[in-house]
């Protein structure tokens, strides 16, 4: 089994580190456009192997895609963060070129790879990866919902005083602080609805804090988060390489599901060796469906920017 992570920044390196520690593949390639960065981080990770007890071979590469040949799974984290004064259109314009180029290079050497997209704006970059490559839709997966759902479980655990591991909670819709939809109605604590233990005000606060979770971290640390995004990407890789048939919320192509077509949005999916294998419709109520439709409209407007490039 071979996995490639494109982009050796904080998110990519963290994702690669998680993959290596869990021994999810025999060979892990970390690739970046900046000279020496991927090689250096790969060596640094390899030098923890004796301490942590893993046996994954980690190879760093400066933009040499031949080293990624034969990858079973590729995680794309490359792209620029949104800078002060940068418009949404400018960010999409820059990162669309990066993601499209990465996909082209990856498929030259790994035509059968499953691609996980973490680059932002994630819903639009996932849609671009799908439409530009022409790959079967099950082989293109956006990470956003997996991260947002983990943040949702964290917020719930803080109010309930329990372990996040004892909670089941999902976020659907877009990966953005105005487009995500935390489904607190469906959240459970060891099978019991969390709404039994939380006041209406607490529920509203948890949903609000989840939606601005990424922005809160950016304000605190001065840059985008990396531990949870990297771990979310690695968890998806694990579900694929171990054929776990595991339920995630991920950004995938919709063809009528949840009332939407020609768009990639976060919904419940089963992930296994074939990528995403099935969409599960948990049944949104009228209020949730209206929010989902609004989220789709916002993401679709971002996707429209791709037509101008």
Q: What does each of the following model-derived ranges do?
A:
Residues 33-71, 300-307:
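Conserved N-terminal Rossmann-fold NAD(P) cofactor-binding segment
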Residues 8-9:
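Glycine-rich Rossmann-fold phosphate-binding loop(s) that bind the pyrophosphate
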Residues 87-153:
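Rossmann-like NAD(P)(H) cofactor-binding subdomain of soluble oxidoreductases
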Residues 51-113:
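Rossmann-like NAD(P)-binding element
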Residues 12-13:
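N-terminal Rossmann-fold NAD(P) dinucleotide-binding loop
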Residues 133-139, 148-309:
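C-terminal substrate-binding/catalytic lobe of Rossmann-fold NAD(P)-dependent dehydrogenases
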Residues 1-3:
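Extreme N-terminal starter segment of soluble prokaryotic enzymes
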């Amino acid at each position: 089994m071979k996995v490639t992570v494109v982009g050796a920044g904080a998110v990519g390196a963290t994702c690669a580190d998680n993959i290596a520690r869990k021994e999810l593949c025999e060979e892990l390639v970390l690739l970046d456009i900046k000279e020496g960065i991927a090689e250096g981080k790969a060596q640094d990770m390899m030098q923890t192997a004796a301490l942590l007890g893993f046996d994954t071979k980690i190879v760093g590469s400066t933009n040499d895609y031949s080293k990624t040949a034969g990858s079973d799974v590729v995680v794309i984290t490359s792209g620029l963060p949104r800078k002060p004064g940068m418009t949404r259109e400018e960010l999409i314009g820059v990162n669309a070129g990066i993601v499209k180029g990465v996909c082209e290079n990856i498929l030259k050497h790994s035509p059968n790879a499953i691609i996980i997209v973490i680059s932002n704006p994630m819903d639009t970059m996932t849609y671009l990866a799908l439409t530009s490559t022409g790959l079967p839709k099950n082989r293109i997966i956006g990470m956003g919902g997996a991260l947002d759902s983990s943040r949702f479980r964290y917020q719930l655990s803080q109010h309930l005083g329990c372990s996040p591991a004892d909670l089941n909670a999902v976020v659907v819709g877009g990966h953005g602080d105005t487009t995500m939809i935390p489904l607190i109605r469906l959240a459970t604590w060891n099978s019991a609805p969390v709404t039994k233990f939380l006041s209406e005000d607490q529920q509203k606060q948890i949903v609000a804090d989840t939606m601005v979770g990424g922005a809160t971290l950016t304000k605190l640390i001065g840059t985008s988060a990396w531990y949870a995004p990297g771990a979310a990407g690695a968890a998806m890789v694990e579900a694929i390489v171990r054929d776990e048939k595991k339920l995630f919320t991920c950004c995938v192509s919709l063809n009528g599901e949840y009332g939407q077509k020609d768009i990639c949005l976060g919904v419940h999916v089963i992930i296994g060796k074939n990528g995403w294998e099935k969409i599960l419709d948990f049944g949104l109520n009228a209020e949730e469906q209206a929010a989902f439709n609004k989220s789709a409209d916002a993401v679709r407007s971002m996707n429209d920017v791709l037509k101008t490039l």
